[in-house]
Swiss-Prot record:
Domain notes: Contains one cupin domain that is not required for interaction with the G protein alpha subunit.
Location relative to the cell: Nucleus
GN (gene name): PRN1
Protein name, per record: Pirin-1
Gene Ontology CC terms, in alphabetical order: nucleus
Disulphide-bonded residues: none
Reported function: Involved in abscisic acid signal transduction. Plays a role in seed germination and early seedling development. Involved in the blue light (BL) signaling.
GO biological process per UniProt: abscisic acid-activated signaling pathway; blue light signaling pathway; response to abscisic acid
Record organism: Arabidopsis thaliana
Source lineage: Eukaryota, Viridiplantae, Streptophyta, Embryophyta, Tracheophyta
Modification type N-acetylthreonine: residues: 2
UniProt KW NADP keyword: no
Amino acid sequence: MTYENNSVPRIVIKKVLAKLEKEGEGAVVRNGITKIDQKLLDPFVLLVEFSFSLSAGFPDHPHRGFESVTYMLQGGIIHKDPKGHKGTIQAGDVQWMTAGRGIIHSEFPEEEVNNGLQLWINLPSTEKMTEPKYKELSSLDIPRAEENGVEVKVIAGDSMGIKSPVYTRTPTMFLDFTLKPGSQTHQTVPESWTAFAYIIEGDEGVFGSLNSSAISAHHVVVFGPGDLVSVWNKSTSRSLRFLLIAGEPIGEPVVQCGPFVMNSQAEIDMAFDDYQNAKNGFEMAKC
């Protein structure tokens, strides 16, 4: 991959291990982004790797004020809402959901073995009450490129001359890289954007600088300022797979409470009231 010689490399400023935790009955999660990192990682609100048994899942629940990206790594989940939208997200598929002013949906596993990731992306105040919508991409529809031992799936943004067709209300890059043993990649990222990586597989990934220590799976790696993210796979036997995620900061107050992401506590209170009274985007809560 080519890049400008005057590029400014982004170095690692923080790394966090997403520890395995139980959540409810039959679900296990790894929380990669929590409230403590929301200011540092603006516009990103939450990142969770999840797996749940056939007896588990998430019955009808509301959302408002953000977009969610669900990316299945293994198995599948069945998604539906009271308006009749229903679909199954299989391994390699993506659902990009704009909750906007209000959406109610459920998510249940299709198979006993399933594993996926969900990212929440904040919306600016001017977009928080937009109409909800879904964009679903099958694995076959996601553009990809391969070069010098590096494969990338371009879910949002662009890489290796390939551009995703997905429109994101908050400008976002979402790339799934797999580096064969001994390979490296250098990805340009807009200088003003926030950028981080989440390692899915591998134990000898070097991020930001060749002088950095190797980082293993299930870590979130946060990058500092610059316009170039460099990654090396130092393993001689194992591939390195990671998500590179970047986005334009919004720079507004963030108040998250449960399924709602707004700008103030008053707006959070209003969201709960609207849901409980089935109004202002949550009319289907009556069903």
